[in-house]
């Protein structure tokens, strides 16, 4: 019995590089939506919170620290090494410390997430309505 092998041509490095250049990075909003799916929570509220807390993704904390949710310690914004890390911290925090505890509306979340701003939930709701 004779074994025959078929040679499969491997792409050259230049061809691989060309393909890689065509792959677009996901936006922060797309990453948040995907991460919400992973954690099993709806994406509408986290997306609205991210838009509010980052000034529609224009804040320094977002641009320089990959902080998509306004997460901070002693009012100092947390910084993350990558956007993926920042998104995971934000959505994971909401999933584990809010949604898992039954806090599933902007009003319920706001009392814990941003207790200093009594208008926070109203603003989140407005952003959700605008994005529909």
Which residues does each predicted region cover?
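Catalytic cores of secreted/periplasmic lytic hydrolases that degrade extracellular macromolecules
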Residues: 1-132
């Amino acid at each position: 019995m004779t074994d025959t092998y078929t040679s499969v041509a491997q792409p050259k490095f230049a061809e691989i590089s060309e393909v890689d250049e065509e792959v677009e990075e996901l936006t922060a909003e797309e990453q948040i939506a995907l991460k919400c799916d992973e954690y099993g929570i709806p994406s509408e509220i986290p997306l609205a919170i991210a838009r509010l807390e980052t000034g529609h993704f224009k804040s320094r904390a977002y641009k320089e620290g990959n902080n998509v949710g306004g997460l901070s310690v002693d009012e100092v914004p947390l910084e993350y090494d990558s956007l993926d890390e920042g998104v995971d911290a934000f959505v994971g925090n909401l999933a584990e410390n809010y949604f898992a505890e039954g806090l599933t509306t902007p009003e319920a979340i706001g009392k814990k997430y941003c207790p200093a701003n009594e208008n926070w939930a109203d603003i989140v709701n407005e952003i959700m309505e605008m994005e529909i």
